[in-house]
Amino acid sequence: MWLVLVWLLGLTGLVGLVGLVDRAAEVPDAGVPDTGAAGAPRLLDPVTLAGRTAPCRVIFGPHETNLGQGRALSARHTAYYQRRAAGGAGLIITETASVHESDWPYERAPLAADCAGGWREIAAACRPHGALVLAGLGHTGLQGSSAYSQSVLWGPSGFTDAVSRETPMIMEEPEIAALVAGFAAAAATAAGAGLDGVELDAGPGALLRQFHSGLTSQRADRYGTDRLALTRDVLAAVRTAIGPGRILALRLSCDELAPWAGVTPEQAADQAAALAPDLDLLTVVRGGPYSASAYRPDAHTPPMFNQDLAAAIRAAVAGAVPVALQGSVVDAAAAQAALDAGAADLAEMTRAQIADGELVAKLRAGTPDRIRPCILCNQTCRVRDNRNPVITCIADPRSGHETTDPPPAADALAAGARAAGDLTSAAPAGPALAAQPITPISDQNGTYRSDQEEAEERGQAGAEGGGPGPAPDVLIVGGGPAGLEAARVAAGAGLVVRLAERSAVPGGTLRAAAAGPARERMAALADWLEAEARRLGVQIDLLAEITADDLDAAAEAGTQIILATGSRPVTRFDPALSVDALAILSGAARATVATAPAQFHAAGPDGTTAGLGGDAVGPRAPAQVHAAGAVGGPSGPAEAVTLPDGPVVVHDPVGGPIGVAVAELLAAAGRQVSLVSQDPVAGTLLSLTGDLADANVRLQRAGVTRELRSLLREVSDGTALLEDVWTGAQRRVGCAVLVDCGHRLPAETLYLARPGTPRAGDCVAPRTVAEAIREGRRLGQAAAQRRPADRTLLTR
C-alpha cells in the first residue's frame, strides 16, 4: 500500500514540475562565487536574529528523521543535531512537531506536547558549539493522515487530498481556536526548554499554507476573505508565548506550481511583504498539494532551483526580514554566489549536512575539497513511508546513527579546532566557536584554497601505488564504493592499506550510475572516496589482478583481507541477443546518432571510454564515465559490444533507476526503445526518492514505449514475447537486442576459493550503493579494532 501512496504523491507532483525544472535550469552556474553586490555577506559570517547571533549563515532545516520514540524526541535526535552543531551549522531547526493531537501525519511524527525533554537536551547539546536551535512547529491539516490518529483530518475547506484521497472536516471556530492555542502552547514549551525560538510551517504540506491558497480554501468568513488571517493570529499568539528576544521564523511556500488557483510567486510576494514585519526569519520554499515532490527533489531538478524565487521574495520584503534560500543548496560556492547576487541572506543546506555533518567546519578550515558531496539521490534521506526507515545518507552511514556508530579517527576532530583552522588539535569545542575569526571561503580569485599540507604530510607519493613495500596491514580487493570506504576508514585509523582494483579507475557502480541522465553527481562521490583514501595514504593499485594464492600470501604475512569484488550479470536469455545494462552504463559501449543505424562501440584496450556522450541527443548530455566490465567486480575490461540495428527492449524486473536511465540513454541516442516491467508503472522503486512521476514523464517525452504489467518470456527471431501478468495473454514486440537490467549475482570467485574471508557490498549480495558503503565502513572499523600494536590512531 505504501508504494501506491507514494506513487500517488509523485503523480500529483506532475502539475507544474516540468516548468519548475525548465526555470531552474536557467539559473546561472554558481560553481564559483562572484563579487556580487557590494557588502554582500559571506556564508561564514555571523548573523543576528532577534538579538541572538548564529556563528554562520548555514541552516540545517527541519525534516523527517524517524528517530523518535513514540511521538517524543529521542537521544538519537540529540546526537544527530549535536553533530551538525559541532560541525559548525549556524542555525538548526528541529523536526517539525505537531502542535495539536489532531495532527499525526506519520507514525513517528513528533508531538510538541511530548517534546519538552527532547528540546531541552538538544539545546544543551548544541549550545556549547554556538549554533542557534529553533523548534519546528506545524500542523499538516488535510495533507496529513487519519491512519494513526483515527480522527478526521482538519482543513480550511472540503478539499480532498490528492494523495490520501481523504476529505477533511471544514474547520469551524472551535478548531481554529484550538489550533491557534496549540501553536502558542507549543512555542511556550520550546521557549521553556531553552530553545532560541521557533519556526512555523506554512510550507508545501502545512495547514497554514492551505489557508493561504485558493486551491484548498474557499471559505467565505474572514479566514477566507483574508487568507493570511489565520497565520496572523498564530504569529501574534506565538510572539506573545515566546516573549521578547527569541526568534520567530516562518517557512512559506511561495509557489504551489498550480497557477490556476494556487499560490503564485506574485501572490506570495504580497503575502511575504504583509507578514514580514512580524517575522525574524523567512525561509522561501516551493510546492503544494499537487507538487509535494518539488520541495526536496532529486538530482533531476537542478541545484539552487529556488534562487530566482527567493530573490523575488527578498525584493518584495525590502529588508524587513532576513530571507533564507532553500532548494537543493548542496554546494557552498553556489550558496555564496546566491548571497553575492542578493538572492538571500542565509542558505539552508539540509541534505548537504546530512551527507557531511562537518561541512561548515571544513569550510572554516580551508578544506572544502574534503566535504563529502551530497549527490541528491534521496535514496536514504527521504524516509516518510510506512517502513519507518531511520534517516541516513548513502555516502555517510553514520548519519542518523550517531549513537551507535562511532566516528572514525579521520572524522573525529572537534569543531572548535577546525573553526580555528587547526586540524591536528582534538581540543573540545566550546562556546568560543562563534567568536572565532571568520575564515573566508574563497580567495580573491573566487576559488577555494586547498590544504596542500594534508597530502604532503600523509605521504601522498606513497599513495600513488607502484613499487613494492612492507606488507600492508589490510589488503582490499575491489575499488568500488565498498572497497573505497573500507580503505578510507581503515587508513583513517592508522592502518597501512593496499587496495587492488582490476579496472582502470576506482569507483565501480558509482561510475556506472553517473552515466544516467541527471545522475552525474554520483561520480562526485566516487571522486571523493578515492581522494580521501589517497589523502590518508592508501596505496591504490589499478589494473591489478588478485588471485587466491595472493590472498594466501597476504594472510601468511599477517595482512587482513577484505573482499569487495562487486557483482556479475545473470544470463537469462540468449547471450547473443542480450546485453547487460552495466556494460552500457559503465562505458563499455557508446551510443552514436547518425544517418546510419546507431551503433555501440567498445571501450579501448585500457578499459576506459568517454562513456555515453559525444553525439548523444537530448536536453542533457550524459557524464563521461571511465570504467568497464562488471563494475566494481573482478571481470576486467569488457568485451566489444555492438548493438544491431533495430528496436531495443529494456527489461527491468527491478524497477529501480537503472532501467529508466538505460531507456533514457538509448532513446536519446535515437533508438526505438520499449521498457518492459511487471509493475503497473515504470521505475516503481523511484517512488521512494520522489522521482517516480517525473521519470514516467521523461520516458513518455523521450518516446519510450512502456510495456507495463508484462513478463518477458523469450527473445527470438527479432521479437520479444511478453505475457500480461493478470490475464496471461501473450503478445510480441520488436526486439533486435535485449538490455538486461535485472538482478545480478555476487562476483564471488575469490570468496568461494577462500570461504570465510570478510567481504562487503555486492559480492555478499547485489544491492545498492548504500549497503555497499555501509558494509565497507563496518569492515574498515573491524580492521581498525584489530590493528597492530605499533599503529597509532591518526589525527588527520
Where are these regions (language model features)?
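A Rossmann-like FAD-binding core segment of flavoenzymes
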Residues: P431, A523-V570, A589, V593-A598, ...
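A conserved FAD-binding loop/helix module that cradles the flavin
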Residues: D652-L665, L685-S687, A760-R796
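Glycine-rich dinucleotide-binding loop and its adjacent helix/turn
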Residues: T565-A669, G756-T768
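Hydrophobic anchor at the start of a short beta-strand
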Residues: V133, L248, V323, V497, ...
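Beta1-alpha1 glycine-rich phosphate/pyrophosphate-binding loop at the start
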Residues: P472, I476-Q539, V650-G690, D740, ...
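Asp/Glu-rich intrinsically disordered low-complexity tracts
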Residues: V21-A24, D29-D34, D411, G416, ...
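A short, basic/flexible loop-to-alpha-helix module at the beginning of a structural domain
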Residues: S399-G416, G462-A471, D580-P597, G636-P644
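Flavin-dependent oxidoreductase catalytic cores
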Residues: M1-S425, A429-A432, Q444-N445, R449-E453, ...
